[in-house]
């Protein structure tokens, strides 16, 4: 059913399937995006009440892999999205993301059960339940961030290796930059910022190589006159660095 894979003993992909269904429902109903915070993670979503964390990650995948193919596979129960995901990253990444979304879903269900149990428990028992709930919340936060980082690095590392034209360079830059609008962030989260700066440096070098006909030995970066595109890349990197510095100073 949907994006789920069934074995004799377990259903895989339930978290991704639930998130995709909710994203479709929110889009049909016309729910507007809202900034929310769950378990220390801040992000923008059009599903603030139902599976918000799962929807945030699924929305990242929809942006990178394609919203149409995600919804089509959900409705028709086929592997088109799965195959495109694997082609854009790897089978290992797909399985890790699928498993992580399931883990988040089940951990949230455990929190609901524990909250219900707490209403019928003694004070000492409640203290133990509260500790368990906090552990689950922290586990969810860490799983979310690890999964988000994996999605970023796996997709954009693969895409970088496929760049073969100057047009590809610009498309890559724009797609990585716009990913910021899909991020879930916590206090002190820097992975995306650090990755972006690193990739912009590599992209600058890649651009120079392609502009010189693919001949890396012909480059003389120090003496090369910067063009408008290279200047743009450097300005974007400086903006990220300046923003990070200001945040540190404000603390």
Predicted feature descriptions by range:
Residues 44-209, 213-215:
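Pan-zinc metallopeptidase signature
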Residues 21, 213, 224, 228-251:
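Non-Sec secretion/translocation targeting segments of pathogen effectors
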Residues 4-53:
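Post-HExxH zinc-binding segment in Zn-dependent metallohydrolases
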Residues 1:
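Short alpha-helix carrying the canonical HExxH Zn2+-binding catalytic motif
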């Amino acid at each position: 059913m949907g994006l789920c894979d069934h074995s004799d003993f377990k259903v895989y992909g339930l978290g991704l399937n639930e998130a995709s269904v909710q994203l479709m429902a929110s889009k049909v109903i016309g729910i507007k995006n809202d900034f929310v915070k769950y378990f220390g993670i801040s992000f923008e979503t059009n599903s603030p009440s139902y599976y918000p964390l799962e929807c945030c990650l699924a929305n990242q995948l929809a942006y990178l892999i394609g919203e149409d193919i995600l919804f089509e596979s959900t409705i028709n129960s086929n592997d088109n999205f799965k195959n495109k995901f694997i082609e854009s990253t790897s089978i290992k990444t797909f399985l890790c993301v699928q498993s992580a979304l399931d883990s988040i879903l089940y951990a949230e269900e455990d929190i609901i059960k524990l909250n219900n149990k707490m209403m019928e428990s003694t004070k000492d028992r409640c203290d133990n339940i509260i500790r368990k709930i906090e552990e689950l919340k922290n586990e969810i936060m860490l799983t979310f961030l690890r999964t988000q980082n994996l999605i970023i690095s796996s997709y954009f590392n693969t895409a970088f290796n496929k760049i073969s034209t100057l047009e590809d360079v610009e498309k890559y830059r724009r797609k990585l930059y716009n990913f910021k609008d899909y991020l879930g962030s916590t206090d002190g989260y820097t992975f995306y910022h650090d990755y972006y700066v690193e990739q912009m440096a590599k992209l600058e070098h890649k651009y120079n190589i392609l502009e010189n006909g693919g001949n890396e030995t012909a480059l003389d970066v120090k003496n090369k006159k910067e063009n408008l595109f290279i200047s743009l890349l450097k300005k974007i990197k400086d903006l990220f660095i300046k923003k990070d510095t200001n945040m540190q100073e404000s603390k």
